[in-house]
């Protein structure tokens, strides 16, 4: 079973700090950003400290392919403005090139919002963007990993059929999927009352063979709300029992599962949530314990 969280790139330590932070939580996989997730600034490759990070991973028996990278949140590959979309394509191309140099494989990406241009038009632009990015990085084995979205605003890819359309149209084994439990629940997939049918539907439409990463988050909102507000593990409307099914589902044991749950009084909850997950027992006092740290 692979469980971890997103971590910071920790100032001057960069990826060294990311790895050490993940290990302090008891993680055996984790997700990083190559720069601040809210902007496009990136430090020179030499300052990422990737070689030392790889030593830390090797000593901890963590496969580098279980270190996931998340693209900047502001990227929009469905952007109808040509120049803005070109900027996004160039940025993701560079992100993949840096990942290839380090040995990272999976780049999780919010595919984009159609900006009132319509879902079909948005998906067509995402497809075109993916094709350009993959052509720009054709020597690499990196994978563009489409995150399932909640359907907030004009987001694309809140339905499995949207993702199927992209995968089929791009036609490359370098396209995969990141399933976010909060997002699919908020999008209207009732994993609480219909877990097996939702997973079977995903398999029928997208294919479990395309599932590369799982974001394991609870939701502050009800099913179908299209809100995208994460809650701590077991403390939202999805609940502990359903989320623990995802973590220990035999079909998903080899897939990295990443917590993106909110801080509790400015304290990261991941060490405590991971311990609770490993114990398979819900602790209703967990948030109180974290807040007292």
Could you tell me what each predicted segment is?
Residues 31, 212-215, 254-261:
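Conserved active-site loop/cleft motifs that coordinate metal ions or position small ligands
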Residues 19-26, 46-68, 95-103, 134-140, ...:
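Acidic (Asp/Glu)-rich catalytic clusters
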Residues 77-176:
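Active-site acidic/histidine proton-transfer and metal-coordination neighborhood
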Residues 30, 132-233:
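Acidic/histidine-rich catalytic cores of soluble enzymes
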Residues 22, 70, 88, 99, ...:
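Conserved, mostly hydrophobic/aromatic
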Residues 81-94, 119-132, 159-169, 195-200, ...:
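Short, electropositive alpha-helical surface patch
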Residues 1-71, 75-97, 283-293:
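N-terminal pre-domain/capping segments
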Residues 6-10, 35-37, 72-74, 112-114, ...:
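Active-site beta-loop-alpha junctions enriched in small/polar residues
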